[in-house]
Curated annotation (Swiss-Prot):
Keywords: Cytoplasm, Exonuclease, Hydrolase, Nuclease. Its EC number is 3.1.11.6. It catalyses: Exonucleolytic cleavage in either 5'- to 3'- or 3'- to 5'-direction to yield nucleoside 5'-phosphates. InterPro entries: Exonuc_VII_S, Exonuc_VII_ssu_sf. Bidirectionally degrades single-stranded DNA into large acid-insoluble oligonucleotides, which are then degraded further into small acid-soluble oligonucleotides. Its main location: cytoplasm. HAMAP family: Exonuc_7_S. This is Exodeoxyribonuclease 7 small subunit. It is found in: Cytoplasm.
Length: 75
């Protein structure tokens, strides 16, 4: 299951918990599933955040090494 699918399921769970009159056991199961999905989504976001930081650091290193940004050279 990818990030978007997990987020969609999580949104559906939240909607059901907020809008439906569910039995306690079903509510608890949905809540537990929601927490599981939240944790997985959070982990994916954290991993991607680190990737972005690494790419930005690499880009900054390239800019620092050349002394100027390629975009500025094109202007």
């Amino acid at each position: 299951m990818n990030f978007e699918e997990m987020m969609k399921e999580l949104e559906e769970i939240v909607n059901r918990l907020e809008n439906e009159d569910l039995p306690l056991e079903e509510s608890i199961k949905l809540f537990e599933r929601g927490v599981e999905l939240y944790r997985k989504c959070k982990e994916i976001l954290q991993q991607n955040r680190l990737k972005i930081i690494d790419v930005m650091k690499e880009l900054e290193g390239e800019i620092d090494a050349s002394g100027r940004d390629q975009e500025n050279e094109l202007r």
